[in-house]
Swiss-Prot record:
Residues covered by region (Disordered): 1-21
Protein's recorded name: Centromere protein K
Subcellular location: Nucleus; Chromosome, Centromere; Chromosome, Centromere, Kinetochore
Stated family: Belongs to the CENP-K/MCM22 family.
PANTHER family in UniProt: CENTROMERE PROTEIN K
Organism listed in the record: Xenopus laevis (African clawed frog)
Coiled coil: 96-159
Function as written in the Swiss-Prot or TrEMBL entry: Probable component of a centromeric complex involved in assembly of kinetochore proteins, mitotic progression and chromosome segregation.
Gene: cenpk
A Gene Ontology term for the protein's cellular component: kinetochore
């Protein structure tokens, strides 16, 4: 029940008949209106059907419709509001009925508005939760960004240089270890030919010529590695008498070294790192 219904007059029972005077008055008014309608109907019947022109029938109908609407508009402008009845009981019953209809319509509107308001509150709560979650993510990312900026500021060029120098030192130390291990392995498994040295000494004593000092396999490989790394555009080694031929042939046979395509006296190390 709406808040203003307590101000309405007492209910008039639908089962109890209205006062006789009010009923008689309403019946008389209805009969008068009915007589007016009959008179209008008889006038329309007597006027007979109106003949339409052969051309522009649609235009003619539209013009007649405009005339009818204009006449109706003028009648409504001239007409003054009429009271249903002067009887207070009739007016009270009609007013109460209209107020009850309005109250029902307003209650329906209120119920609909409340339902929409409830739904909007739920949607607003969901949106607020989503917004809070997004704000937390933004705050976390902003905090992380500030931390990275601080770290980047503290990470100076001197520190970068020191890190690179330390890594380079470790690489060089590791390289020396590998070369040392390679030298020990080659010295153990690929020693210089003793007989060749002895024969060279004998020939030196007989002919008086200087003997050729052969280069170890370790030294040959180290030269080839250095040439490949320092001068990659020209990594070839020119073969000389102190390069023992069996070592050279072994390197070529096992694919460790390659000959120059135009000069067989020049070899290079296979680029295993590429």
């Amino acid at each position: 029940m709406s808040g203003y219904q307590h101000e309405l007059p007492p209910n008039i029972s639908k089962t109890s008949p209205a006062p006789e005077e009010a009923r008689e008055e309403l019946l008389q008014q209805c009969e008068a209106i009915w007589k007016q309608m009959e008179e209008c109907q008889s006038k329309l019947t007597m006027s007979g059907p109106e003949t339409l022109p052969e051309t522009d029938v649609q235009l003619y109908l539209l013009m007649m419709q405009v005339k009818a609407l204009t006449a109706e508009y003028e009648q409504w402008q001239k007409r003054t509001p009429e009271i249903i009845s002067d009887n207070q009981d009739v007016l009270l019953a009609v007013g109460k009925e209209e107020l009850e209809k309005i109250a029902q319509e307003l209650e329906m509107v209120l119920s609909s508005v409340q339902a929409k308001n409830k739904k909007l509150k739920k949607d607003l709560e969901k949106e607020q939760n989503w917004l809070d979650g997004q704000q937390k993510i933004v705050d976390a990312l902003t905090s992380r960004q500030d931390e990275l900026k601080n770290q980047l500021t503290a990470f100076s060029e001197k520190r970068v240089y020191q890190d690179i120098a330390g890594k380079l030192y470790k690489v060089r130390a590791h390289k020396e270890e590998l070369l040392s291990a390679l030298g020990d392995f080659l010295e153990e498994h690929f020693p210089l030919p003793q007989e060749q040295e002895n024969q060279s000494k004998k020939k030196k004593g007989q002919s008086g010529k200087k003997s050729v000092q052969l280069m170890t396999l370790h030294e040959i490989l180290e030269i080839l590695i250095n040439k490949l790394m320092t001068t990659p555009h020209d990594p070839y080694l020119v073969l000389e008498p102190h390069h023992w031929p069996p070592y050279i042939e072994m390197l070529l046979r096992y694919g460790i070294a390659l000959r120059h395509p135009e000069d067989p006296k020049r070899i290079r190390l296979e680029a295993f790192h590429q």
